[in-house]
Amino acid sequence: MSKRIEYIVDEILDQYMYADTSFRPWIIGFSGGKDSTVLLTLVWLALRKIKRDTITPFQLRRPIYVVCNDTMVENPIIATYVDEVLAQIETKAREEDLPIFVRKTEPKLEDSFWVNVIGKGYPVPNTAFRWCTDKMKIKPTARFIIEQVDECGEAIILIGTRKTESATRARSIKKHEVYGKRLTNHTILRNTYVYAPIKELMLEEVWYIINAIPSPWGFDNSILFNIYKDASADDYECPTVVTDKSHGSCGQSRFGCWVCTVVKDDKSMRSLIKNGREWMKPLYDFRIEIDQERNIIENRMPYRRDGRRAINDMGPYVFSYRAKMLRRLLEVQHDLQKHDPKIKLISDQELIAIQVNWYRDFNFGYQVSEIYNSIYKESFNMEENIKNKLEADLMKEICFENPEEGELIEQLLLLQRSKSLMQRRRGLKNEIESRLKEFVNNKKQ
């Protein structure tokens, strides 16, 4: 282990034990990429050193949360890899009795990508309208951090940002760092501090740690190395300092959402396909398709969702295009499941929420279940409890100013369902009329 790496481990140890005597939690943002992997590796080594060199376990009372945000549209290869790594981290932390705990965050259902694009008609993001970052990345993790601050008073976020990543990263670090101080104030969240232990590491050192130091949680780091190698585009060159001459160029590949239309081209996915993952090509083609169709005027409504005229008549997607996109998405999912049945590009909850949003926008011409059934040749099972919850939420929103009318509608729906279950529709019309008269009479009193 190099002197610089030993120094970082000792600095982390000092910050954990001596520089900060409180027990405010550490929160490590973990993506499964090279930098967050190295950060967690060095923190783990520091904790092992504390446990080895101290007499009492009291020194390890500060909790460390490994927080991974799932946007629900992650690259399937990365998503599978990260899930396996997180499971191994949790298992090994319990075996070694370390205060490391895995937490996964994800956007709320109404903030998910497909509910917004297919359900509400949001145009797919671009550089001018990048609505996805806040809804799908920032908010979910921020909610977890705020919960920790509310419970503990303060929290410290450990990030794997490095100065040599880019000129932009270097400027950002320099702007916020305070000379002689390890911690800086979070720019947005109150009572939250930021610690960047590996900010001075070079890319060569990052790969050295991954390839030369065994994963503390027992995972095979060569898997990560090979993912980066296969995802490296031709115009990238990775300056590798590794222990085995068989390691070639691994690139500086960046992984994001597979459906991201903010970038012009998904070079990492294109390279993965080129290097043997041909089954991913439908994903790549679908992303290009929805990007190219974004600004076709026939695909857009002339009005915004709030009723105002849209600029250049480019409002939300029309319902026919939303239905077309859903059909194409499910076709791609069905195709990918021939390679791996576990792959899901859209969840059942999202499908239900899309239908609810279509009803909310008075679209009754397209049915999610019909689209699904035409592709999978089987009935789409809308879990009754989820369906009922979404209906109840919708009812509360619509009848916010007149809750008694919402109660009436619920009663009428229950009446209709009970008759349907008993297969006795006779008398339903009379009972509905009777209930309506009773409601009107009560209102008059």
What is the predicted function of each stretch?
Residues 1-27, 36-445:
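Nucleotide-activated chemistry modules centered on ATP-dependent adenylation/adenylyltransferase
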